[in-house]
Amino acid sequence: MVKPSLKIRKKVKKNVVEGVAHIHASFNNTIVTISDRQGNALSWATSGGVGFKGSRKSTPFAAQVAAEHAGRAALEYGVKNLEVRVKGPGPGRDSAVRALNATGFKITSITDVTPIPHNGCRPPKKRRI
């Protein structure tokens, strides 16, 4: 018996004008995700994913390159306006926002959504160098 041939559908790129940039800046890495208003991810990039390994991942320059990479991919969806949400205390917070601005997006708002515990878990011990 002959199997019916599968039709290959071309993926339709949706046109999104307003997006949300989620920047998660930890001490070890920076993750930049650009989504639509509903939270569906359009593009993302990390400092480690764009070629930085080890201690170079946690630099502001690595966060800048990751933000540019995610921004260029989001431009294909037609994103023009961005609302930026920054989470975490990492060194790549500001440079990622500046890189998104330089990519050509109009940034409408910058919000800090870092989770702050109401005396939750015990924090890690202080480093002795």
UniProtKB/Swiss-Prot annotation:
<keyword id="KW-0694">RNA-binding</keyword>
<dbReference type="InterPro" id="IPR019981">
    <property type="entry name" value="Ribosomal_uS11_bac-type"/>
</dbReference>
<dbReference type="InterPro" id="IPR018102">
    <property type="entry name" value="Ribosomal_uS11_CS"/>
</dbReference>
<protein>
    <recommendedName>
        <fullName>Small ribosomal subunit protein uS11</fullName>
    </recommendedName>
</protein>
<dbReference type="Pfam" id="PF00411">
    <property type="entry name" value="Ribosomal_S11"/>
</dbReference>
<dbReference type="GO" id="GO:0005840">
    <property type="term" value="C:ribosome"/>
</dbReference>
<dbReference type="GO" id="GO:0006412">
    <property type="term" value="P:translation"/>
</dbReference>
<dbReference type="GO" id="GO:0019843">
    <property type="term" value="F:rRNA binding"/>
</dbReference>
<comment type="function">
    <text>Located on the platform of the 30S subunit, it bridges several disparate RNA helices of the 16S rRNA. Forms part of the Shine-Dalgarno cleft in the 70S ribosome.</text>
</comment>
<dbReference type="InterPro" id="IPR036967">
    <property type="entry name" value="Ribosomal_uS11_sf"/>
</dbReference>
<dbReference type="GO" id="GO:1990904">
    <property type="term" value="C:ribonucleoprotein complex"/>
</dbReference>
<keyword id="KW-0699">rRNA-binding</keyword>
<comment type="subunit">
    <text>Part of the 30S ribosomal subunit. Interacts with proteins S7 and S18. Binds to IF-3.</text>
</comment>
<dbReference type="GO" id="GO:0003735">
    <property type="term" value="F:structural constituent of ribosome"/>
</dbReference>
<keyword id="KW-0687">Ribonucleoprotein</keyword>
<dbReference type="InterPro" id="IPR001971">
    <property type="entry name" value="Ribosomal_uS11"/>
</dbReference>
<keyword id="KW-0689">Ribosomal protein</keyword>
<comment type="similarity">
    <text>Belongs to the universal ribosomal protein uS11 family.</text>
</comment>
